[in-house]
Amino acid sequence: MAADMQRKRSSEGPDGTLAPSDGQSVERAESPTPGLAQGMEPGAGQEGAMFVHARSYEDLTESEDGAASGESPKEGAGGPPPLATDMRQISQDFSELSTQLTGVARDLQEEMLPGSSEDWPESPGAARRPATEPPRDGAGEGDEEEAAEAWRRHQKHVFVLSEAGKPVYSRYGSEEALSSTMGVMVALVSFLEADKNAIRSIHADGYKVVFVRRSPLVLVAVARTRQSAQELAQELLYIYYQILSLLTGAQLSHIFQQKQNYDLRRLLSGSERITDNLLQLMARDPSFLMGAARCLPLAAAVRDVVSASLQQARARSLVFSILLARNQLVALVRRKDQFLHPIDLHLLFNLISSSSSFREGEAWTPVCLPKFNAAGFFHAHISYLEPDTDLCLLLVSTDREDFFAVSDCRRRFQERLRKRGAHLALREALRTPYYSVAQVGVPDLRHFLYKSKSSGLFTSPEIEAPYDSEEEQERLLGLYQYLHSRAHNASRPLKTIYYTGPNENLLAWVTGAFELYMCYSPLGTKASAVSAIHKLMRWIRKEEDRLFILTPLTY
């Protein structure tokens, strides 16, 4: 697209309040087509990226043996070349799918339609049932069998153990009661490795058993959900990174070098709720599926003032200054030569949402950002701007002794917000943290997920009827998960997927520039789906400065 990329920016008026500035500003073209390529898609940052470039699902799960994750690749380095796409091309792609999708649709029908109660996931309440406790003294054999049956009813189990077979974590049940099960898992892994093979997954009788080995730990998921083995492996990697965020990779390796059968639960005692919360977030928050962060919808003028205030309220030791609201990003300012990885940001989201104690004052806690640097700790200053709001300020420092200097940054940031009139605008934005899909103006559109790959950000509307129950919301996310797994299948990735079902139609379109997943009325046609894409992309382009951070700032 040959259109200029600048947008309206904001500045302070004479009285210090927000005022738009139109000088130097040329709007992007309203239409995102033709010639849409990476860096030109709706939501693409105009002045560099905030995150390590994670162009695809595969980039998020690459081995730590790759390049240093704290450094962003140079423009044009690595990855596939940008793909130019336009509406004629997508129309042609979908026309050609009529034959190609015959087999795919059959698979989708078999795997996505509700089956028997044995196959269909449990209700959300059951899925988050507290872990089964070991039987009390004097409990009868019937009680033990009932507890075991309750444990087996869960749709997904997660286990973490050491290479010596010592239990570290289990999603349900006690580690002691499951130690023999974990021992069998380690024996299976070791047996195959003796023949120089590596076990990745087992598929049998509707179950998937997925293994991820990150020495000195082995992580295992046992699931009868519609998630692919690849996505289950991604969840296990998140759990591994969660453990590293508490210990650091260097400390973890040192512990097991000294004592191979060390019981890691001693060090992780009390952190189970953080891992539990991470699993719950991954079950309902599409941020993890998309490998991206979602921004709080906010007027560009307000966001610019918030970012500038963060930039100016800094200390020498600060690396990242982040303002969050309900697991949505409001603003992020980084040191000029450092980039955050989406996985590290998700782990910070999880840390904050897993504890209400951060609302009680200013916290100063060590935290490892494993994709940035797994060898050491940063220190994070965490505080809510006000106890009755969801605005949480996160200041990441390299100096453990710098609490008071970083705390003063918080004070100066709040002063600047009030002086510029942005504080009240933020509180008002929190009243409507999500937008309605009706604003898009596509009658049959029910919901969508859109990710800009170059910015590492995504947007989606509020989930509304007919998905207003928790069970239906989890079902919708399950449909997106399935489309995502087909689009990113390691052996046969699909660029476009079109599915028609009894309850909704689904569409996926994955390019080098963006990913789009749409859900709309089952009465729609393939032609209307293509038309809906065009309207939706035009709307996202029009609203991009409210839905994305287009001009990220640095110190």
Curated annotation (Swiss-Prot):
An MF annotation (GO) of this entry: guanyl-nucleotide exchange factor activity
GO process terms (BP): protein secretion; protein targeting to vacuole; vesicle-mediated transport
Keyword Cytoplasm: no
Subunit structure and binding partners: Interacts with CCZ1. Found in a complex with RMC1, CCZ1, MON1A and MON1B. The MON1A-CCZ1B complex interacts with RIMOC1. The MON1A-CCZ1B complex interacts with RAB7A and this interaction is enhanced in the presence of RIMOC1.
Cited function: Plays an important role in membrane trafficking through the secretory apparatus. Not involved in endocytic trafficking to lysosomes. Acts in concert with CCZ1, as a guanine exchange factor (GEF) for RAB7, promotes the exchange of GDP to GTP, converting it from an inactive GDP-bound form into an active GTP-bound form.
Matches recorded under PANTHER family: SAND PROTEIN-RELATED, VACUOLAR FUSION PROTEIN MON1 HOMOLOG A
Family to which this protein belongs: Belongs to the MON1/SAND family.
Annotated protein name in UniProt: Vacuolar fusion protein MON1 homolog A
Organism: Bos taurus (Bovine)
Phylogenetic lineage: Eukaryota, Metazoa, Chordata, Craniata, Vertebrata
